[in-house]
Amino acid sequence: MAESMRGLKRTCRCAELSAANVGQTVTVMGWVQKSRNKGGIVFVDLRDRSGIIQLIFEESNTGAEGFEKAAKLRSEFVVAVTGEVTKRSGAVNENLETGDIEVVAKDIRILSESETPPFPIEENSKTKDDLRLKYRYLDLRRPDLQRNLILRSRVATLTRQFLAEEGFLEIETPILNKSTPEGARDYLVPSRIYPGSF
């Protein structure tokens, strides 16, 4: 069951956290990358467009209801978690920018549940192209495609800023191109000026 975001605001993105944030209470939001239930403790890798942070859920911190929610998390659930940033008590994960810290969860809200995706949302996936294209909205969550989209956005923004600073005007002109109804028919629009014509 999806919960409300009322009164909740993200304080930072996952990969923006570092050892400098140890001791701070933060709210992070994103997709569940992995969830590992070890009995009395649940580890979750939370992913947003910036990267991944490890979350730890213990019943003593989240209460019985919060721990029960954490125990049912699956891949691609969307969650909002509030907790305290701490140094990792176990081994440091050298593969993550945030590998030396974790967030000890105090509160969790499940914003959206998800069925198991048809392929793993991860970099260098060996998934066939036709399946990736069928589920393009999931494929665009992969880190390598996210980086491409972010880079494209930054280049477009910098280009616009540069041209604006040089005194250029951005004018949106009509784009003349061939109609592509893709199997459907074009809509016929009656003419107001010439009755009976389209």
Tell where the protein language model's regions lie, with residue ranges.
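Class II aminoacyl-tRNA synthetase-like tRNA-binding/catalytic domains
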Residues: 3-198
